[in-house]
Amino acid sequence: MAQSVPPGDINTQPSQKIVFNAPYDDKHTYHIKITNAGGRRIGWAIKTTNMRRLSVDPPCGVLDPKEKVLMAVSCDTFNAATEDLNNDRITIEWTNTPDGAAKQFRREWFQGDGMVRRKNLPIEYNL
């Protein structure tokens, strides 16, 4: 059963952090590539620490082995002088899909007893 095998690795480009540059009076969009480097189909989902400022499209999906997806992380306008910019990040969570599951994302894959892996990408704001 897929849930007893730990999910393989993913690769992200960029691999360490996301950087948004001032000015912040316009919406900025940064693209991230996620690659399933493992040998099994995975379901993935993105979480953000600041849903008011950061949005992700698509927020979840399914990747076959070696398959890639390009997603957009958008930063809405904000006042850099009054906002706390220290702890923003996005977190990519992924888990193996059940054997025989259709290639359609299902939130319940993350709610069972299967292993879920996480990768954090801090957000850096250049002022």
UniProtKB/Swiss-Prot annotation:
Name of the featured protein: Major sperm protein isoform alpha
Start and end residues of each MSP domain: 9-126
Keywords: Acetylation, Cell projection, Cytoplasm, Cytoskeleton
InterPro entries xref list: Ig-like_fold (IPR013783), MSP_dom (IPR000535), Nematode_MSP (IPR051155), PapD-like_sf (IPR008962)
Main location: other
Function: Central component in molecular interactions underlying sperm crawling. Forms an extensive filament system that extends from sperm villipoda, along the leading edge of the pseudopod.
Lineage: Eukaryota, Metazoa, Ecdysozoa, Nematoda, Chromadorea
Cell compartments where the protein resides: Cell projection, Pseudopodium; Cytoplasm, Cytoskeleton
Tissue: Sperm.
Pfam family of the protein (one): Motile_Sperm
Positions where N-acetylalanine occurs in the chain: 2
Gene Ontology cellular component terms for the protein in this record: cytoplasm; cytoskeleton; pseudopodium
Quaternary structure and partners: Forms filaments 10 nm wide, with a characteristic substructure repeating axially at 9 nm.
Protein species of origin: Ascaris suum (Pig roundworm)
Statement: the UniProt record of this protein carries the keyword Cytoplasm: yes
Disulfide pairings: none
DNA-binding in keyword set: no
